[in-house]
Regions:
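Metal-dependent nucleotidyltransferase catalytic core
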Residues: 27-34, 76-103, 108-109
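Conserved catalytic core of nucleotide-sugar-dependent glycosyltransferases
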Residues: 104-129
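Active-site nucleotide-donor binding segment shared across nucleotidyl transfer reactions
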Residues: 39-72
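Catalytic metal-binding acidic patch
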Residues: 63-83, 150
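Catalytic cores of NTP-dependent nucleotidyl/adenyl transfer enzymes across multiple folds
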Residues: 7-17, 28, 32, 120-207
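Non-catalytic N-terminal targeting/anchoring module and adjacent flexible stem/linker
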Residues: 1-2, 86-90, 204-207
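Helical scaffold of the NTase/Pol beta-like nucleotidyltransferase catalytic core
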Residues: 1-52
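Residues that flank catalytic or metal-binding motifs in active/ligand-binding sites
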Residues: 68-72, 103-105, 112-115, 142, ...
Length: 207
C-alpha cells in the first residue's frame, strides 16, 4: 500500500517501511555517509535543524555513533516541516528513499538500509514538543555547533546540559539499550499551575 505526501512540487507516493527499536544495529560507515550527505543538503537551506537524542549523545561522548544505536536523530522546527518535505526529490537524487511519515511528528528517510529520523518539534508553553518529548526553550534559544566527522553540525544550545536533562546526570556512562526517555514535564507543569490560574481568574472577575 502506498502513502502520499503533499509537497509544493506535487504529490509524492511511497511505500512505508516498518521501522522499530531493536530491528538492527547501526552500520557506522553507511550512517556516516548518510549524515554527511544530509549536512551537505541541509546546509544550503534555511531550515532550522540539528543533532539530537542518541546521535548527539554519541557525537559528544563517543565522537562517533553509539555502537548499539539504530538510526540518526535530527530535530526540525515544526515551522520548517514543509521545507523538509519539499526536499524529498533532492534526497532522492542522493539515493535516499522515504521510509515513513507521521504528519505532525516524524519523517524518516533511508539509504543503504540506514535511516534518518526527523522529529518535528512544535512550539508549546516554555518549550517545544514532539510526540512525548518536551524540551525547554533554553535549549532552542540559540543553536550551537559541534564537530562530528571533521565537519560542523548544528545542535541544541548548551548540549551537555541538554543531555543531562534528557538522559540524567550519568549520561556520560554508556548503557546498552538505553534510549531517550519520553517526558511529560509540560503536562505536569500545566496541571500544577492550572488551579492557581483558575483562582486568579475568579479573583479578577469578582473584584
Amino acid at each position: 500500500m502506498q502513502n502520499i505526501i503533499k509537497t509544493s512540487k506535487g504529490e509524492y507516493k511511497f511505500k512505508p517501511i516498518n521501522l522499530f527499536h531493536g530491528k538492527k544495529k547501526i552500520n557506522k560507515k553507511k550512517a556516516r555517509e548518510n549524515i554527511l550527505l544530509l549536512r551537505d543538503i541541509l546546509s544550503k537551506t534555511d531550515i532550522r535543524w540539528g543533532l539530537i537524542f542518541g546521535t548527539l549523545l554519541g557525537a559528544i561522548r563517543e565522537k562517533n555513533f553509539i555502537v548499539h544505536d539504530e538510526d540518526i536523530d535530527i530535530y526540525i522546527f515544526y515551522e520548517d516541516k514543509d521545507k523538509i518535505l519539499d526536499l524529498i526529490y533532492e534526497f532522492n537524487k542522493f539515493g535516499f528513499d522515504v521510509a515513513r511519515y507521521e504528519k505532525k511528528s516524524l519523517f524518516s528517510i533511508i539509504r543503504n538500509n540506514e535511516y534518518i529520523d526527523f522529529y518535528f518539534f512544535k512550539k508549546k508553553l516554555f518549550g517545544r514538543r514532539c510526540l512525548d518529548y518536551y524540551i525547554p526553550n533554553l535549549f532552542f534559544k540559540n543553536s550551537a555547533k559541534i564537530k562530528f566527522f571533521n565537519q560542523y553540525f548544528p545542535t541544541l544550545n548548551n548540549a551537555h546540559k541538554y543531555l543531562e536533562f534528557q538522559y540524567g546526570k550519568d549520561w556520560k556512562v554508556p548503557k546498552i539499550n538505553s534510549h531517550a526517555k519520553p517526558n511529560i514535564f509540560w503536562k505536569k507543569f500545566i496541571k500544577s499551575i492550572f488551579p492557581s490560574l483558575v483562582a486568579i481568574y475568579h479573583y479578577w472577575k469578582n473584584n
